[in-house]
Curated annotation (Swiss-Prot):
Belongs to the class V-like SAM-binding methyltransferase superfamily. Residues 75-89 have a biased composition (Polar residues). Residues 68-132 are annotated as: Disordered. This is SET domain-containing protein SNOG_11806. Residues 473-579 form the SET domain. The keyword Ribosomal protein does not apply. It comes from the Eukaryota. Its EC number is 2.1.1.-. The keyword Cytoplasm does not apply. Residues 104-115 have a biased composition (Acidic residues). The lineage of its organism: Eukaryota, Fungi, Dikarya, Ascomycota, Pezizomycotina. One of its GO terms (cellular component) is chromatin. Pfam families: SET. One of its GO terms (biological process) is methylation.
Amino acid sequence: MTALDGIEGLSECIGRAIQEHLARSNLNLAWPQIDSLDRPILRFEAFIEDAGAVSTVASRSEKIASRTLDLTGMKTPQPSRSPTVTRNVATPHAEALHDRDDQESADDDDDDLQDDAAAQTASRKGTGGLRVANSQLIREDLSENQRQMQVDSRTFPKRRKVASEKFVFQPSTLDKLIIGIWEQAIFEQFQVAPNSVSSVVRHAPMDAAPVALSVTTEPSGGSFSQMNVFCRKVTQASRVCRSIEIIVQARWTELFEEQVQARTAAHPELSSTKHRKGVFMEACQDFGWSEKELRNKMAIWRGYKDVKDAAGWAALVFAGMGIYRFCKYRVGFDKEAMRRLKNLRNRLEVAADTLHPHWRQLLAIVGEPQALKYPGHPHEWVVYEDGSDPVPLRQTYIEHDPFFSFEHIEESVVDGSVWGCEDPRWMPQESAITRASGTYMCALCNEQQSDEPKLNACFCFPSLFGCVKRKPPPVQIYRTAEGKNNGLIALTAFERGTAVGELVGLITNGVRHLDVMEGSTPLAKYQIWQGREGNYTRFANHSCKANAQTSNFTWLDTQRVILVSKGIEAGSEITVDYGDKYWAGLDKSCLCGETCCRYKRDGRR
């Protein structure tokens, strides 16, 4: 191995350092020696010599480093030359340059020159008088923003909306409390037996025999059914006892304040703080608790009282476990929260009186009246968002129609004067096998349909069809503030793809100049008129940016029109797009207020 080969890294290091220095310095010097050469290069060689040698003829050691750098980029171009010049690497000048080299280093440098010449085989364009600095360019990574086409998620319809990658605000503690109250008031099987309040507060006799509960080890249909009934009763009783506990604790807080005021009025010479301390110590003695225990409990009970003062007794009776957390940690427990609860007071009482007629019997324990304020059907009352007193449904239409009447029905009624004994919504089964066997198959999921929950396998709209018991819808009819008369408001959220309700009414045909829903089957065309009878879907207003839509669904060979949610938030109005055919030729203007409104006509209502 030669010395040059052994220190090859030194040549590379020196060459790289010189090249970087020339690039950073941006040298712009006029070197006549460079301009006179066709392919100028910079050659450097390194030797080891004795610095103390006096003789002019000093013996050189063997060369330890050698490198050549191309200086063509520093050459000043001639204006008379062609814009593009093609250069051949193998030129006579280059060969002459090699001939002038020292004979000692000729063999070692031929390889370096050949490597540099191979890198300059490409054509070079001529430049102007200003030379471009030989600096490193910053290249953008194109892989970071490649404009690729993505598959649209709407190509594959989904029942539920996929989770968004963006940040979504979660409901506040107050929102969770309100939603929990609505869910308990609407969906919970809250039952209070009539005339049983006195038995709830009456102490059981000491000689009462305990009830023995035994469960057989062998599975039996009768014992299992009995256990189901017993467990349901215990769960309902526990739920009622929890409501009684909350209203009694709220009432005790009121009596505590009344006792302090009474003692202050009787003995004004003492401060109210001393009277409060005396009443507090008396309560600790009666409860058998320490001051710390009673003080912690009173802080929560005082929260119950504040909620009762704002939202009424119904908020306490139908509140779930969320009210305990809300009153204990008091997150968002401010004046704005109390204002929102106050606006919900009458609306909560409407739902409680119409869905749970016996709930006020619990208030007899705290001395409150038991008479219902809002009896009747849940959708027979029109509520207000600002907390005003609800009014009967007929009162909102009597100004325009003195003979207005509306009957709330669960199933559509076929107009016998038009269709006779036939139902125009009938959809025959496509398969001859299913027609012969008498079974009903769903056209969407291809599963068996039946009103018997044990036999039903179709769960396209489980809240409406094939369920054990259809629950009341979490909606109320409310008075809109935009001049649209009545509207439909959602008390809880409706997930995307879930059913809001079925459009029921009079199945007829030939109705003109009235709001109707048109439907058709392969055998007939029909109309659903909800002018005199129907359900809450009648009050869904139009919006050009609706959050619900109508959809056809066949159940037991009968076509139904379902109002399906597109994603409805709790507390928002439920709207549907009536369509172009409805607005064609109609002398009215759309009042939806959306920026994408399609039927806004100036000067019309």
